[in-house]
């Protein structure tokens, strides 16, 4: 059993490096195809890319959340993403483009500086996402047929859910992400200074629960909705970097938003749901 487990982990550890070297098939010839390939490669190895690294402030890659550079059918995929933009963003209070969304991810999920939307990094990633969308209809996607159970679970969350989430984490996540959530090998940190900040999309517990339910454990997602929620609650009550918008915008930035002041913390994210970090964890 230990031999099989070790072999499985070795395969998983090697997978990101193998995928990063993948040559995409069916690309258009010339500069556009080259841009698409670069966009894919930067997503697979953002923190190791010469072009993307200056905008990355943690130990994550885009593929840490967008598995296989988003070329999957699970939550976090990029299929049919380009056709959803331009779109109104409540967070920014503005109609934003795909390029805006990519640039904003760098300062939130990657905890780095926001690149300009006309930078080669953003343009190449947008080219890749658009290529994945080839042949897809340009239309507003239908609303989910079944409402998410997680907002209601969040409103009713108790310290017992945090404790249960730690148990789920230990049994299903710690082998790859470490008991301290700092990540092991090529598996990313889930909290702490090298993970996504409190302004990231996955800092939203309901969104993280949806992502976990569809993707984790890697290669064998099998958690119940309650387990996915509890482990998401546990992860998002751990320490992570605060998000202060002004600290992620370079002079002369092209941030497309009507909201120009934003600060998010682990505690403030819970307060938005009517919860107290201290009550849930006994911490400060």
Where are these regions (language model features)?
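Post-cleavage N-terminal segment of exported redox proteins
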Residues: 1-48, 87-162, 238, 272-284
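A cross-kingdom marker for long, charged
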Residues: 239-284
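Amphipathic alpha-helical interaction segments
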Residues: 57-60, 64, 120, 124-127, ...
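Extracytoplasmic electron-transfer domains, predominantly the class I c-type cytochrome c fold
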Residues: 33-38, 42-44, 71-115, 125, ...
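A structural motif
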Residues: 98-99, 133-144, 175-183, 201-208
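Surface-exposed patches in mature extracellular/periplasmic domains of secreted proteins
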Residues: 49-55, 113-118, 138-142, 220-226, ...
């Amino acid at each position: 059993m230990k031999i099989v487990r070790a072999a499985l982990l070795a395969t998983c550890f090697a997978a990101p490096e193998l995928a990063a070297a993948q040559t995409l098939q069916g690309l258009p010839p010339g500069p556009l195809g080259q841009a698409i390939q670069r966009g894919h490669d930067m997503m697979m190895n953002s923190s190791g890319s010469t072009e993307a690294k200056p905008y990355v402030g943690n130990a994550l890659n885009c593929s840490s959340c967008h598995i296989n550079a988003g070329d999957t059918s699970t939550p976090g995929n990029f299929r049919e993403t380009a056709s959803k933009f331009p779109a109104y963003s409540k967070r920014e209070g503005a109609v934003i483009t795909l390029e805006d969304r990519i640039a904003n991810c760098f300062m939130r999920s990657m905890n780095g500086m926001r690149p300009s939307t006309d930078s080669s990094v953003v343009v190449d990633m947008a080219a890749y996402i658009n290529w994945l969308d080839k042949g897809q209809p340009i239309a507003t996607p239908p609303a989910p047929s079944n409402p998410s159970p997680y907002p209601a679970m969040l409103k009713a969350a108790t310290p017992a859910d945090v404790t249960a989430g730690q148990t789920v984490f230990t049994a299903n996540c710690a082998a790859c992400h470490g008991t301290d959530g700092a990540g092991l090998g090529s598996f990313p940190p889930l909290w702490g200074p090298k993970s996504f900040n409190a302004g990231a999309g996955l800092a939203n517990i309901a969104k993280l629960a949806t992502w976990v339910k569809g993707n984790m454990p890697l290669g064998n997602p099998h958690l119940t909705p309650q387990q996915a929620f509890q482990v998401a609650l546990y992860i998002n009550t751990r320490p992570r970097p605060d998000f202060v918008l002004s600290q992620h915008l370079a002079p002369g930035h092209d941030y497309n938003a009507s909201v120009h002041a934003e600060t998010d913390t682990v505690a403030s994210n819970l307060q938005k749901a009517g919860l107290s970090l201290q009550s849930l964890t006994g911490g400060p």
